[in-house]
């Protein structure tokens, strides 16, 4: 049968009803597309609103072609009058289309009988017929509708409509338009004006040369559709196959699926694919779209899956994608490049002295003490910042007064002003540890300690009496060490020093021991773990640690190298799990963070991890392990994992530790045996907290408690030892147990004590960098890094945008921006609009801190962050809180300007601050103003604040 798609210039439903009721009018119908097939009948069709089984047109009436002579109208490109359609109407074929509307017999009063003629049925059911036509069919009356839906050119409209409407297939209009562009690679015909009349539109389509190519296009589109389906099916298969065999954490797996499809179907890749499957005029119809089969799947494998196959294999990841730079030092103690010559000294002091000796003070007392030291030593030593940063600098410095004094005073260090006791003088020649002690009622004291009584105050004298020095299992050995337990805190800092102590990280000191804060997030429903599960977990983690250490640093002997494990005690049944980790701070809390870091501290992180994740599936304890529970932790399992770097090897920058933690986070998910153990019970991704490796961050020491934030005076969640003995000490484990009890082996900056003798020790070395080649930033994992590479719009480099703002178009290719240039940009273009919004929208007591007579100083910290300070003579000062008026306001709030880019040359600047009070969310980043600064050559409307 022959199908004719037609349109009208008047309401199509009424015109069709007139044809059905055989009511002549002056209207015409305009044939647009014709699908010929030898037949006496011609079916006139309209596009349906809904398509069942991809049928997008349906007939509204049929005519007898012998009477109508359709070819005569098509050849003349003329519309068909209604009179011709009425005269040729085939009622026998048309009536079944509307029979369901004529359910009730109609009686004619004039004839006294039932109406049976079709035209009379339509007349008496006129409203039902119109309603049916309007509900089922699309009835556009303007060419602009067809142009907006199917395309703006002659070939685009004709070929798209012919395939989309007449061929039973599942392609969308956008897909068919893409097929047309691949079929007509050179010319798509003339552009159709949107103001054309329906007659002009019909004449254009009926006379188009593209009508001769419809059959060829249909054959190509069918072949292309089949090829597209095969390609996408192969991509689906590859993505699912890798997902099933790869050991990906749940969240990473979801992101992987998105990344894989974005990689396979990226814009550049689809443009290449279009060239491969473009129409070949010289090829036979059956040979169309057969070049390079599996194109998208091969590219997906090359660009992503092959890389992920290596990146998510532990051996390949460590060998191919992790790069370590080590600097070998001179072994001569008098050389300038020896560890001694470079000042790579760790903590001194005594851990088993006769008494506790050191400085103890709150943040306010610390500020006063440092001010006093500055006053006493102003002519000899540089002034110290009146905060924890100043104390860390004081305790790390090896400088003495030899430049300005003679005799014995040349060995006099600035620490002597902090600890003037003469008996401590020999202990002050090396750096001192700085601790934070948590007191009841959420109070905190900072300590710089030269001597303490670690073993005598912390452990009972007979602690090791029942520990065997013979072959024992790790589980049995751990059970032989019993520690006395306390639960009520003391208000005395000296007493609480041995219960709630935290080591403060000092970036000015070398790191000898890698201290890992490992929080394993448990799946919902996991409320108990068997002893075997916990110890197998620790043994698996030790295996991963040793594999990473041997690959990154060498000179690692897995059968001898110590790894010390400590587990947070399980919460009692009466204590909520999420009471274990509330953030700490008060209004008197001073700055103790690195200025470039905005992450939460260890306690804040633990509190955050206690928030339940609704995205994990339920798992009951009985399905995890049927043995009695050894661990009753819910939500997360907290471990402290400490291991020294190989002998004679130190790290000198926090970024190295963050990179090592990033490598370990990834490696934990790649060990096959460990993954089998972890997958049913936990979400192992990002278990290591990298935020503790920043200047001024603190981490709880082993054997220490947490303070209960609700009760105020009670302690809980003590870090208890789990002894995982290396094979070399399995026969005589007592020495290893003693080493795990030794404080010197548990601190960031203390050289390890009683290290086992190694067959071959390396020369002195410094770890300069550890870098994941694919994910160089510790802030983003593999999936996030690769996702940035396939985004539609890429941000311009910050250096490029800064240079454009400084020098215009000529400087957009500058290789680097100096601190002086960055300061000039901030002063001239960034700070004025920020200050304007600050003075307009903030209280005067806040904004006046940034205006005259105060002199501001802008200190760049990299290219994207600038610290704002106030100059006070030779010193700098911070600001009071910009959000609240605290009960004890202090000038300890740090203010920064962040710079970031977008895909244009516009520059975004954000003014934010960091206040260390609990009311301001304990060191959280508080953004105050964000403005968009347009490039110099763009019109400059007022900066927009967000």
UniProtKB/Swiss-Prot annotation:
Location of this chain's protein in the cell? Host nucleus
| GO aspect biological process, one term | bidirectional double-stranded viral DNA replication
Q: What is its main location?
A: host cell
Q: Which residues carry the site feature described as Essential for primase activity?
A: 517, 519
Q: Where is this region: Disordered?
A: 596-626
Q: Which domain of life is it from?
A: Viruses
What family does the database annotate? Belongs to the herpesviridae DNA primase family.
Whom does it interact with, and what assembly results?
A: Associates with the helicase and the primase-associated factor to form the helicase-primase factor. Interacts with host SNAPIN.
Protein's recorded name: DNA primase
């Amino acid at each position: 049968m022959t199908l004719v798609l037609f349109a009208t210039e008047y309401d199509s439903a009424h015109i069709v009803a007139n044809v059905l009721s055989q009511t002549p009018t002056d209207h015409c119908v305009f044939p647009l597309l014709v699908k010929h097939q030898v037949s006496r009948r011609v079916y006139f069709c309209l596009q349906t609103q809904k398509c069942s089984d991809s049928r997008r047109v349906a007939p509204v009436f049929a005519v007898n072609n012998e009477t109508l002579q359709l070819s005569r109208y098509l050849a003349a490109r003329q519309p068909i009058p209604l009179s011709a359609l009425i005269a040729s109407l085939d009622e026998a074929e048309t009536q079944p289309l509307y029979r369901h509307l004529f359910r009730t017999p109609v009686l004619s009063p004039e004839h006294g009988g039932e109406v049976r003629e079709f035209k009379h049925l339509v007349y008496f059911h006129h409203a039902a017929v119109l309603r049916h036509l309007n509900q089922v069919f699309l009835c556009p009356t303007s060419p602009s509708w067809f142009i907006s839906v199917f395309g703006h050119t002659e070939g685009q409209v004709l070929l798209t409509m012919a395939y989309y409407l007449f061929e039973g297939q599942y392609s969308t209009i956008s897909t068919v338009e893409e097929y047309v562009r691949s079929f007509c690679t050179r010319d798509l015909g003339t552009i159709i004006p949107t103001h054309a009349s329906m007659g002009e539109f019909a004449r254009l389509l009926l006379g188009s040369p593209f009508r001769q190519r419809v059959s060829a296009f249909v054959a190509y589109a069918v072949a292309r559709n089949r090829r597209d389906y095969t390609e996408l099916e192969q991509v689906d298969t590859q993505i699912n196959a890798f997902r099933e065999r790869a050991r990906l954490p749940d969240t990473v797996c979801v992101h992987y699926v998105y990344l894989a499809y974005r990689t396979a179907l990226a814009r550049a890749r689809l443009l290449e694919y279009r060239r491969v499957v473009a129409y070949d005029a010289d090829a036979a119809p059956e040979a169309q779209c057969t070049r390079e089969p599996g194109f998208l799947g091969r590219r997906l494998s090359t660009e992503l899956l092959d890389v992920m196959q290596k990146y998510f294999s532990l051996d390949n990841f460590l060998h191919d994608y992790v790069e370590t730079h080590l600097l070998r030092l001179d072994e001569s103690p008098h050389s300038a490049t020896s560890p001694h010559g470079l000042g790579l000294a760790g903590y001194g002091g005594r851990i088993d002295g006769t008494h506790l000796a050191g400085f103890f003070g709150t943040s306010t007392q610390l500020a006063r003490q440092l001010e006093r030291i500055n006053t006493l030593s102003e002519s000899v030593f540089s002034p110290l910042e009146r905060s924890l940063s100043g104390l860390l600098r004081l305790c790390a410095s090896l400088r003495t007064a030899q430049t300005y004094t003679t005799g014995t005073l040349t060995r006099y260090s600035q620490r002597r002003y902090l600890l003037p006791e003469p008996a401590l003088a020999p202990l002050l020649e090396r750096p001192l540890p700085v601790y934070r002690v948590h007191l009841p009622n959420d109070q905190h004291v900072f300590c710089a300690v030269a001597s303490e009584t670690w073993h005598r105050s912390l452990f009972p004298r007979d602690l090791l009496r029942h520990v065997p020095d013979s072959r024992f299992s790790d589980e049995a050995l751990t059970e032989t060490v019993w520690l006395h337990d306390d639960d009520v805190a003391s208000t005395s800092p000296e007493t609480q020093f041995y219960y709630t102590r935290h080591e403060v990280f000092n970036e000015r000191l070398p790191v000898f021991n890698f201290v890992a804060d490992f929080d394993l997030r448990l799946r919902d429903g996991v409320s108990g773990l068997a002893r075997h599960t916990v110890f197998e977990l620790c043994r698996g983690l030790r295996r991963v640690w040793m594999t990473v250490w041997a690959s990154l640093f060498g000179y690692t002997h897995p059968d001898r190298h110590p790894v010390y494990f400590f587990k947070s005690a399980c919460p009692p049944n009466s204590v909520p799990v999420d009471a274990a980790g509330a953030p700490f701070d008060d209004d008197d809390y001073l700055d103790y963070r690195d200025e470039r870091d905005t992450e939460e501290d260890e306690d804040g992180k633990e509190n955050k991890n206690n928030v339940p994740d609704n995205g994990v599936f339920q798992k009951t304890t009985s399905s995890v392990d049927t043995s009695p529970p050894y661990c009753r932790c819910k939500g997360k399992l907290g471990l402290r994992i400490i291991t020294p770097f190989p002998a004679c090897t130190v790290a000198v920058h926090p970024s190295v530790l963050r990179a090592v933690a990033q490598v370990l986070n990834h490696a934990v998910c790649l060990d096959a045996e460990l993954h089998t153990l972890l997958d049913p019970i936990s979400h192992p991704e990002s278990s290591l907290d990298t935020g503790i490796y920043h200047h001024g961050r603190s981490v709880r020491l082993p054997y220490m408690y947490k303070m209960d934030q609700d009760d105020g005076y009670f302690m809980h969640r003590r870090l208890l030892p789990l002894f995982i003995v290396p094979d070399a000490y399995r026969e005589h484990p007592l020495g290893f147990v003693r080493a795990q009890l030794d404080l010197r082996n548990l601190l960031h900056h203390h050289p390890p004590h009683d290290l086992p003798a190694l067959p071959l020790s390396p020369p002195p070395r410094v770890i300069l960098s550890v870098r994941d080649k694919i994910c160089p930033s510790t802030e983003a994992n593999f999936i996030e890094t690769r996702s940035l590479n396939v985004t539609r719009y890429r941000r311009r480099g910050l250096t490029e945008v800064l240079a454009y703002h400084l020098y215009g178009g000529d400087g957009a290719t500058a290789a680097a921006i100096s601190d002086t240039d960055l300061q000039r940009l901030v002063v001239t273009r960034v700070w004025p609009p920020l200050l304007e919004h600050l003075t307009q929208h903030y209280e005067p007591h806040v904004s006046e801190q940034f205006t005259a007579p105060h002199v501001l100083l802008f200190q760049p910290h990299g290219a994207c962050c600038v610290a704002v300070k106030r100059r006070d003579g030779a010193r700098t000062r911070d600001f009071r809180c910009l959000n609240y008026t605290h009960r004890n306001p202090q000038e300890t709030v740090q203010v920064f300007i962040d710079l970031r880019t977008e895909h244009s040359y516009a520059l975004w600047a954000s003014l934010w601050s960091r206040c260390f009070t609990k009311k301001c969310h304990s060191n959280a980043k508080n953004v105050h103003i964000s403005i968009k600064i347009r490039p110099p050559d763009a019109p400059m409307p007022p900066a927009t604040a967000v």
